[in-house]
Structure formats: C-alpha cells, structure tokens
A protein has these predicted regions:
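Hydrophobic faces of well-ordered beta-strands that scaffold small-molecule active sites
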Residues: 49-51, 78-80, 116-120, 179-183, ...
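Active-site neighborhood of glycoside hydrolase catalytic domains
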Residues: 152-217
C-alpha cells in the first residue's frame, strides 16, 4: 500500500511537471511516460530498477565496469546526478571533459543496455560539498541559495544551458538513453517555494529538455 502511495505521488509530480512530454518522438527515438499505475516505455509497461552512480567518485576507466555491475545485479537504469561544482569550479569556466564527461557516461550506459535518469539539481545533496553548489556563489554575501534570488537564478540558468548542450541530445526522444530529468532535489524537505520550483522547471525545459518527462522528488 505504501509503495502504491509513493508511486501515485511520483505520478502526480510527473503530471504537474511534464505536461505533454513524451507524446511525440523523433523517428529514431522513443517515448517514456507515466501511465495508469505504471510507467510506459514506448507504450509498454516498464518497471524502473535504478542504481545510483556518481561519476566523480568513480575513476573514468572504471565507469563501464560499474555500469556492467549494476546491470548484472538486475538494474535497468542509472540515476545520474550532475555536480555543478565540478563542472564550473571557477565562474564561467565550464569543464565537461575527461572525468567530467557526463555525455560519455550516458553513452556508456546506453551501450550496455541501460537507461538514464538525469538529476541536474542545481542542488543534488549526495553527501557532496555544498550539495554540488559552487563555492564561489558565496562571494555574493547576500545571496539566497535555492530561492528566486536574481543572481542565483541567473547562474543556474547559465549552468543548465551547458548541461543541456551535453545531455539534451541524448534523451530517449532523440534515440538516447535518458528517460527522465529531475527538477531540483529533495526540495520538499528544505522549502515550500513552489514558484521557485516552477522557475527551475522552466529553466530545465529552456536548456533543451523540451520533450523528456520531468519529475520532482
């Protein structure tokens, strides 16, 4: 009963965030939507069995090995946080190469028959310094993190645009492995600013995730 309640909550979040996402797809792509008490992958019931893998914590030569281990354990999906403070360690200096090549991580997942759920934050928790928020945000002494602070939102939008450049072409609608994208992370335990969450949703959409299903939890 509890599991059903959790699923209904997630489906409600999907309905509120996704709108008509997943209704159309490129000819070489697919769809992923929330159906009646189940997820639908290309129109067929699909149970998400997800493993959490943090690419900064795994040396790049071992990425594929860890993905294969997850598949061997019966998983079909990898959840992927995007750690803002490793991709933009200095303001306006973005790095998505080498150990930070999240697009390659997703391609390795697809190569091994795994789907991907992207969780770009901006806050990701993950027992990671500042939950992934860059230290340099604090140079602005009056900044309000995870609120509609103009400077914070401007920086989030810039970062998400870079994430979109890397990952939006890899959604299932474009033939890639990404089936869902999370909006913020565990925000309900932090605040109740619904307009802020809606603004983050809009930024995620604007960054290129126009068709993929969004969710919040």
């Amino acid at each position: 009963m509890q599991k059903l309640s959790i699923f209904r909550t997630l489906v409600l979040s999907l309905a509120l965030l996704a709108g008509s996402a997943g209704a159309s797809a490129a000819t070489d792509g697919g769809t992923f939507t929330a159906g009646n008490k189940t997820f639908l992958l290309n129109g067929k019931p699909f149970v998400v069995k997800a493993a959490e893998l943090h690419y900064p914590r795994i040396p790049r030569p071992y990425w594929e090995h860890r993905i294969k281990m997850c598949k061997a354990l019966g998983m079909n999906t990898v959840c992927l946080y995007v750690f803002w403070n490793i991709h933009e360690q200095r303001e306006d200096q973005f790095d998505f190469t080498g150990q930070n090549d999240i697009a390659e991580f997703c391609r390795l997942a697809q190569k091994n028959g795994m789907y991907v759920i992207v969780r770009p934050g901006p806050y990701v928790c993950a027992e990671w310094e500042m939950g992934g928020l860059p230290w340099w945000l604090l140079k602005k002494k009056d900044i309000r993190l995870r609120e509609q602070d103009p400077y914070f939102m401007k920086r989030v939008e810039k970062f998400m645009a870079k994430v979109g450049e890397q990952l939006a072409p890899l959604t299932i609608q474009h033939g890639g492995p990404i089936i869902m994208v999370q909006v913020e992370n565990e925000y309900g335990s932090y605040g109740e600013d619904k307009p802020y969450v809606a603004a983050i949703r809009d930024i995620v959409r604007k960054s290129g995730f126009t068709d993929v299903t969004l969710f919040q939890c």
